[in-house]
Regions:
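Residue-level signal for well-ordered alpha-helical segments
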Residues: 8-12, 29, 75-79
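A residue-identity detector for tryptophan
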Residues: 5-8, 47, 60, 157
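Beta-strand elements of well-folded, non-transmembrane domains
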Residues: 4-8, 56, 98-106
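Glycine/small-residue-rich interface belts in oligomeric ring/scaffold proteins
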Residues: 16, 21-66
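N-terminal, Lys/Arg- and Ser/Thr-rich interaction peptides
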Residues: 1-18
Length: 195
């Protein structure tokens, strides 16, 4: 379990193409990405988010951001010619408690490309990866900086031990509408399907 927070967050709604508008709360895929930033072993394990608790009231703010109005391609982009100011509707002062379980992939079920650089031992078990995560999360270690929707909005985090007394989540019930759960990269890595 992790408690994550930050000054700003933007979990962009895909149906709004031009201006960035955030979902009301963190998406499950963004929550999974925070766990993966701390520990990611592509062929050995994956994270499955089981519960997201909202700890701070949902507050909105708008800002204008400079963005590049062109797709990166083979030719270089002169940023000064392609710069655009766009409005963003963001979340302010967010705090979440995210619960996830580690799904271990047994050695026999891993694809052949998993063994190109590293030959795992046959006695690998999920506890090895759970302890790696626990150690890394409690010491503030990560492979990449976790973020809250957009890389500009860095996430602070704290590992929550099972013995800690937890503050109750926000006592509010609200319809969040349709929300992207995650992307399925199993079938096609180039064009994943929405889940």
């Amino acid at each position: 379990c992790l408690e994550v927070w930050g000054d700003w967050a933007c979990f962009s709604r895909p149906e709004l193409k031009v201006e960035r508008v955030s979902y009301d709360v963190i998406t499950p895929s963004a929550a999974r990405a925070i766990f993966e930033a701390i520990l990611f072993k592509r062929y050995a394990m994956r994270w499955q988010v089981t519960k997201i608790e909202v700890l701070n009231p949902i507050k909105w703010t708008t800002i204008r951001r400079n963005e590049v109005g062109a797709l990166a391609g083979k030719s270089s982009i002169f940023i000064e010619d392609k710069r655009q100011q766009k409005n963003s509707l963001l979340l302010q002062g967010v705090r979440y408690r995210i619960h996830a379980k580690l799904v271990f992939i047994p050695v026999k079920d891993r694809p052949k490309e998993a063994f190109i650089k590293h030959q795992p031992s046959d006695d690998e078990n999920p506890m090895k990866y759970y302890q790696m995560f626990e150690r890394r999360a409690s010491q503030g270690q990560c492979f990449t900086q976790p973020y809250l929707g957009c890389r500009e909005f860095a996430a602070n985090w704290k590992y929550i031990d099972n013995t800690e007394q937890l503050a109750p989540p926000l006592a509010e019930d609200r319809d969040l509408g349709i929300m992207l759960y995650d992307m399925d990269f199993e079938g096609n890595v180039q064009k994943p399907n929405a889940m």
